[in-house]
């Protein structure tokens, strides 16, 4: 499976390199191992639909002696902001194995996916857990303060349960666009959690 090295933070004297690989280049064993690790890291609060959302884009992996210890993914979505459908890199499945937490591995996989965001998208977005909010704020991600919605088959529908969890990272907005994080934003439709 082809990997691209992206970042190599040193934590506790150990060098961990985040590697990028597209979903299409993952063999079945690696993909299934990543799914299991992410589900375990989320302590069961991560569904098959959540994993499905993480497929089809780039994955950042950190392995130690062949075992996956950290993961993040970025997939393409469209977010409607005012009259523009922004090309969005949506970050999914950011997870660090429990016995490796607190060593900067989440930072390393985020460095990798943010490199992808800056190279390919107009906007980064993610739905943050309460425990991860501080990390995203420290990296320059902006909490979305306006109303969220989804463009579902029946039309635009508000998603008030997601209003507090959305974060965005402007990386290449169209010329002249100012991002107002108090405005409404709408995501494209998908099964499971839409945000």
From Swiss-Prot:
PROSITE patterns found in the cross-reference section: GNAT (PS51186)
UniProt cross-references to InterPro entries, sorted A to Z: Acyl_CoA_acyltransferase, GNAT_dom
GO BP terms in the entry: response to antibiotic
Keywords: Acyltransferase, Antibiotic resistance, Transferase
Residues bound to substrate: 45, 92-93, 127, 161-162
Catalytic activity, EC: 2.3.1.-
Residue ranges of every copy of the N-acetyltransferase domain listed in the record: 21-180
A GO term, aspect molecular function: acyltransferase activity, transferring groups other than amino-acyl groups
Top EC group: transferase
SUPFAM superfamilies per UniProt: Acyl-CoA N-acyltransferases (Nat) (SSF55729)
Entry binding sites for CoA: 94-96, 101-106
Family recorded in the similarity comment: Belongs to the AAC(2')-I acetyltransferase family.
Subunit structure: Homodimer.
Function: Confers resistance to gentamicin, tobramycin, dibekacin, netilmicin, and 6'-N-ethylnetilmicin.
Protein name: Aminoglycoside 2'-N-acetyltransferase
Organism of origin: Mycolicibacterium fortuitum (Mycobacterium fortuitum)
């Amino acid at each position: 499976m082809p990997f691209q090295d992206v970042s190599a933070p040193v934590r506790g004297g150990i060098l961990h390199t985040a590697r990028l690989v597209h979903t299409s280049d993952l063999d079945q064993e690696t993909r299934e191992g990543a799914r299991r690790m992410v589900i375990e890291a989320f302590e069961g609060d991560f569904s098959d639909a959540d994993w499905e959302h993480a497929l089809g884009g780039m994955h950042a992996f950190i392995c130690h002696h062949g075992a996956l210890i950290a993961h993040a993914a970025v997939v393409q979505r469209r977010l409607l902001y005012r009259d523009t459908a922004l090309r969005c890199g949506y970050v999914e499945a950011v997870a660090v194995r429990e016995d490796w937490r607190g060593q900067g591995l989440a930072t390393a996989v985020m460095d990798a996916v943010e490199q992808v965001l800056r190279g390919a998208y107009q906007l980064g977005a993610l739905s943050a857990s309460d425990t991860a909010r501080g990390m995203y704020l420290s990296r320059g991600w902006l909490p979305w303060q306006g109303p969220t919605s989804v463009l579902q088959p029946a039309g635009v529908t508000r998603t008030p349960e997601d209003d507090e969890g959305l974060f965005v990272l402007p990386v290449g907005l169209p010329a002249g666009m100012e991002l107002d994080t108090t405005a409404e934003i709408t995501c494209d439709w998908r099964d499971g959690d839409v945000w």
